[in-house]
Amino acid sequence: MARYNPRQERSLKRHSNYRDIKQSFLIICEGVNTEPDYFNAFRLTSASVKALGKGLNTIKLVQEAVIVRNEEQRKGHNFDQYWVVFDKDDFSNHDFNEAIRLAESNGFQVAYSNQAFEYWFLLHFNMYRGYIHRNDYEQMLSQQMKVKYSKKDYFTTKIYGMLLPYQPEAISRARKILAEFGNTPPSQAVSSTTVFKLVEELNRFI
């Protein structure tokens, strides 16, 4: 679940010279801290990541992502992969599904979570199926990690190493859960996440 932070953007670049790398990612995130900090923690050897936290949700985030992508291209920065990362939260089913459709129609891949990004973290520890309100995520994560979960700056960067040994299981669980929902619209697939797809892509370049 995204929270407003006066730091509206963070640009995270692995390399300054786009010509010297094999792959580049532009990741536009709903959350200002949690998601960008997490993706910044990936130690990529043959790719660059530019992750921006916008503090916007669903359709507005996708619209902003298109603007950012176009601005980057005008500067001569053409990325290999474009992603948006956002949550269902309490937004309407229509807005959530439409945001996914709009993103994909504009050339973005989508790493969504229903209900919130922290569900991806929970899957590192157990196979959590069914409805879990996002307000419970932080307490559940704190219990699992033996450290108080926080949305403050760089917290998810710090816990990346803690989560990493469990990442293969999280990917497997997220994929299995998503498959179980079949053709269920994303807005009704509670709980589920496609963050694992972005994680798998990033892992190709570690």
Positions of predicted regions on the chain:
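A broadly used, surface-exposed interaction patch
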Residues: K50, K54-E72
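Helix N-cap/beta->alpha junction signal
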Residues: E30-V32
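C-terminal accessory helical subdomains adjacent to catalytic cores in phosphodiester-
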Residues: A2-L26, E35-P36, N40-L52, E71-W83, ...
